[in-house]
């Protein structure tokens, strides 16, 4: 499988990216190198190798889910850099 500049142009349009002609050639080359590497991985003999979902033997690395009393609104608002009544006050982010 090979990637053409037409393919890269299509992908760039989907991603809303714009490339110069030099960048387009570079991206085409780099994508072809990646695909070539993946093709090499497909050639690896994995006969007799067990499939793995993880590389280590850890069974459960999560802590126990223990229920605690929730913080009061007052305690939570003590962490607020700025507040108004019972609410966090944050800078406007939408014009």
From Swiss-Prot:
UniProt subunit comment: Heterotrimer of A, B and C subunits.
Record EC number: 6.3.5.-
Example of a GO biological process term: glutaminyl-tRNAGln biosynthesis via transamidation
Enzyme class (EC, first level): ligase
Name the record gives this protein: Aspartyl/glutamyl-tRNA(Asn/Gln) amidotransferase subunit C
Keywords: ATP-binding, Ligase, Nucleotide-binding, Protein biosynthesis
InterPro entries for the chain: Asp/Glu-ADT_sf_sub_c (IPR036113), GatC (IPR003837)
Annotated family: Belongs to the GatC family.
Pfam families per record: GatC (PF02686)
Protein function: Allows the formation of correctly charged Asn-tRNA(Asn) or Gln-tRNA(Gln) through the transamidation of misacylated Asp-tRNA(Asn) or Glu-tRNA(Gln) in organisms which lack either or both of asparaginyl-tRNA or glutaminyl-tRNA synthetases. The reaction takes place in the presence of glutamine and ATP through an activated phospho-Asp-tRNA(Asn) or phospho-Glu-tRNA(Gln).
GO MF annotation: an example: asparaginyl-tRNA synthase (glutamine-hydrolyzing) activity
Originating gene: gatC
Catalytic activity as recorded in UniProt: L-glutamyl-tRNA(Gln) + L-glutamine + ATP + H2O = L-glutaminyl-tRNA(Gln) + L-glutamate + ADP + phosphate + H(+); L-aspartyl-tRNA(Asn) + L-glutamine + ATP + H2O = L-asparaginyl-tRNA(Asn) + L-glutamate + ADP + phosphate + 2 H(+)
